Amino acid sequence: MSKFNRMHLIVLDSVGIGAAPDANNFVNAGVPDGASDTLGHISKTVGLNVPNMAKLGLGNIPREQPLKTVPAESNPTGYATKLEEVSLGKDTMTGHWEIMGLNITEPFDTFWNGFPEEILTQIEEFSGRKVIREANKPYSGTAVIDDFGPRQMETGELIIYTSADPVLQIAAHEDIIPVEELYRICEFARSITLERPALLGRIIARPYVGEPENFTRTSNRRDLAISPFAPTVLDKLNEAGIDTYSVGKISDIFNGEGINHDMGHNKSNNHGVDNLIKAMTSEDFKHGFSFTNLVDFDALYGHRRNPQGYRDCLHEFDERLPEIIAAMKEDDLLMITADHGNDPTYAGTDHTREYIPFLAYSPSFKCSGLIPVGHFADISATIADNFGVEKAMIGESFLDKLV
């Protein structure tokens, strides 16, 4: 019998808690990540008021310098620690895959200066359409269609862009490039980005409609991902007949592997919390695991180096946390963590190599406090231990510490 009948894991995308031991091996605009500290710098520069996460023990997590505006709790209601990454990467897929028990020794490729000419030329030759070279760089998905949508409507050229993650995205106006044609082009792009030097996690079709200054992305998005190279704890749960719920982009990150209930994409963090609560309160979800990604911290504020917006986004989540806790059953476990850092005060615009926070809460807890500093994959091992399934590649369970 499971110690916790249901487990809920929320990833606050990019909410790191201080530079990892190997952070200087990773750079941002030529600056090593060794001084990065997402939560620390937000707390120091613009203030951070997250009383509900503080109650769980966020301010108790060991650091060289305590979080300036998040006090330690003398009697927290949950367990807390920080976790270190072992994989060779600081992107979303690497972080999530390791959290589910894999060690990624060959990092995905990211293209901060845009994709090489060879890839663009191959796509042009396959599609018979030119690629707008000026869009070929990391770009906001809404900004790129605002900037190049009018040109695409005139010329039929492809808008190809990327982000901080290992993705190639193709935006196409549905009246100019039909959705099925866009899908075929994306399938070709997927076929040429399966190995180094262009090993990409996802190819994303981004259809949109409308007129200049009023473009809207449609629900016809399609993600062409690659599956994890080995079974994750999601697969182990699924094979054992245990329900697994995806909220947000989790299903995309794992290419649907090991997911048997997909709550769909989130329009925002708040929408994601709504979807999580909908899953938690469903009569069908009696036993199993839910996995939620809330990406606004990263996508809207981290890459754009906006500490005020990042802070406000954290405040917004913290205000919703009591609703999530209210949806829990007595024998549920809630876990809150991250997948990498993205210090909005740091050099460059890329992710930062950081520890991630880990908070755990259950209404059934008799004790609380700190658990030993561990690794990302310890989360997956704890999930496997709880449900009595085989763990994935790496990770050590701390289930016995949660009492």
From Swiss-Prot:
UniProt-listed Enzyme Commission number(s): 5.4.2.7
Catalytic function, reaction form: 2-deoxy-alpha-D-ribose 1-phosphate = 2-deoxy-D-ribose 5-phosphate; alpha-D-ribose 1-phosphate = D-ribose 5-phosphate
Cell compartment(s), UniProt: Cytoplasm
Record-level Gene Ontology MF annotations: magnesium ion binding; manganese ion binding; phosphopentomutase activity
Listed InterPro entries: Alkaline_phosphatase_core_sf (IPR017850), DeoB (IPR010045), Metalloenzyme (IPR006124), Phosphopentomutase_DeoB_cap_sf (IPR024052)
GO biological process terms on file: 2-deoxyribose 1-phosphate catabolic process; 5-phosphoribose 1-diphosphate biosynthetic process; metabolic compound salvage; nucleotide metabolic process
Protein name: Phosphopentomutase
Species for this entry: Streptococcus thermophilus (strain CNRZ 1066)
